[in-house]
Amino acid sequence: MCLSLKVLDEGIKEMARRVLKSEDGTIMSDHATLIRGRIMNSAKELLAKEGYSKTTIRKIVEHSGVLTGSIYYFFKNKEDIFRAILLELVRDCINKINQNCCDESPLFKYAAVCQVELKVLADYKIVRETYLEGYNSTIIFEGMVAQFVEMARGLFDDTEYECSDEGYYQNTLMVKGAMHACLSEMFFRREVDSAGTRESLLRLALGVFGVKEAEINGIVEKIRSMNDTWERIGKEMVEHPLVK
């Protein structure tokens, strides 16, 4: 049952490898990869402490010890760094869910990824504010949708829930749009039942793929029972380096 997520992880790694290619098509050296990782880890740490608006290229330079020119060699701007961080966070989340839920179904793993992201946003205010910037950016949001399309494809291809390319895209757009709404709700003045909203999101995410209500109920119930696991995974994602 781990195979689908392993295939997915390879797909996301390939996306990362394409990012790491230089203009002549060669793969960057280990040293270049190390420098890029240092930039991303420093940016992630700053984002978690100060939020998106206060994290500047200058602060990333000071925190990472990497020269400004080197940062612009790898990334166009701060938004580009944030987009790369999100790619790594998704891959990290997938790996952790694969380790903790190896014997679970593709549907459960898909729901678990959604659950972990929303749980992190509910538990960490500064991360919540940073993610809202990402969701509000057309470029970054489009990248989020693309990542979730690849995740769904890796999980559901060759199953009864396999979709066409357009089907994967439409379903993912609905799910990520709903996740954006869940995130925005956390900033509303009215008191919010975040756990209830997350469960509604999971039901929608599974429902768009045609999952029957009885199976959805079972998955949601099990997701609810593993709250400690999601808290631990979320804490590791926020506090641990992206690239070791």
Predicted regions and their residues:
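Amphipathic alpha-helical packing segments from all-alpha helical-bundle domains
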Residues: 135-184, 196, 203
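N-terminal positioning helix adjacent to the helix-turn-helix/winged-helix DNA-binding module
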Residues: 35, 39-42, 171
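C-terminal peripheral helix-coil segments that are non-catalytic and often amphipathic
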Residues: 1-20, 157-158, 188-244
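Helix-turn-helix
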Residues: 38, 46-80, 84
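Secondary-structure edge/capping motif, primarily at the C-terminal ends of alpha-helices
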Residues: 97-101, 128-131, 185-190
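Hydrophobic alpha-helical connector segments
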Residues: 84, 95-127
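A short secondary-structure junction motif
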Residues: 89-96, 120-124, 128, 151, ...
